[in-house]
Amino acid sequence: MAEEIVVGRIGRPHGIRGEVTIEIRTDVPHRRFVVGAVLGREGGGTALTVSGAHWHSGRLLLHFRGVDDRGAAEALRGVLLTIDADQAGSPLDDADGDGEAVEMWWDRDLVGLRAVTTAGMLLGHVTDIIHSPAGDLLAIGGPDGGEHLVPFVRDIVPTVDPPAGRIVVDPPPGLLDLD
């Protein structure tokens, strides 16, 4: 069985005709969520085929074949949408179509990386990536058993180097209690 990559999470229903909001977990929603796309469900279950897709007030709304009312849409709330890893392509593909590679990583590529500060101090290892509407956070498990939540933005995480097995964190004052 091929490895699955999560590309989205189904949110609340929108309207009465089966549309749902999507929490996007891919940098290429214009390629992943097109009409006719077949998306798996994390852990198995019947695949979902996109039969309609559009943006409304900054949110992606999808309609799936066979999901024709609010009740059916509500039953899908929280489902993680997946693709097979072999369908994903390289995370360094030209994701936005401008002819240049885009720097992005799959969650699975980040979990387990060693996290160090710009001064070389070990913070721990990446244990999870938390996706939220406000932005992504890296959960870093410390050697003392504690956990740091670090906003995954270039200003704070300037270096991500999976081949070297590390990320570099440049925390602003007050972000981490390092004393």
Curated annotation (Swiss-Prot):
- One GO CC term, this protein: ribosome
Q: Where in the cell is it found?
A: Cytoplasm
A Pfam family recorded for this sequence: PRC_RimM
- Keyword Cytoplasm listed? The answer is yes
Instruction: Tell me which Gene Ontology terms the entry assigns under biological process.
Output: ribosomal small subunit biogenesis; rRNA processing
Has UniProt tagged this entry with the keyword Nuclease? no
Cystine pairs annotated here are: none
From the Swiss-Prot or TrEMBL record, what is one GO molecular function term? ribosome binding
Q: Enumerate the spans annotated as PRC barrel domain.
A: 102-175
Protein keywords: Chaperone, Cytoplasm, Ribosome biogenesis, rRNA processing
* InterPro entries, sorted: PRC_barrel-like_sf (IPR011033), PRC_RimM (IPR056792), RimM (IPR011961), RimM_N (IPR002676), RimM_N_sf (IPR036976), Transl_B-barrel_sf (IPR009000)
The text the record gives for the protein's domains is:
The PRC barrel domain binds ribosomal protein uS19.
Q: How does it assemble?
A: Binds ribosomal protein uS19.
Q: Which family does it belong to?
A: Belongs to the RimM family.
Q: What does this protein do?
A: An accessory protein needed during the final step in the assembly of 30S ribosomal subunit, possibly for assembly of the head region. Essential for efficient processing of 16S rRNA. May be needed both before and after RbfA during the maturation of 16S rRNA. It has affinity for free ribosomal 30S subunits but not for 70S ribosomes.
Q: Which NCBIfam families match?
A: 16S_RimM
HAMAP family assigned: Ribosome_mat_RimM
The name of this protein is Ribosome maturation factor RimM
Could you tell me which species this protein originates from? Frankia casuarinae (strain DSM 45818 / CECT 9043 / HFP020203 / CcI3)
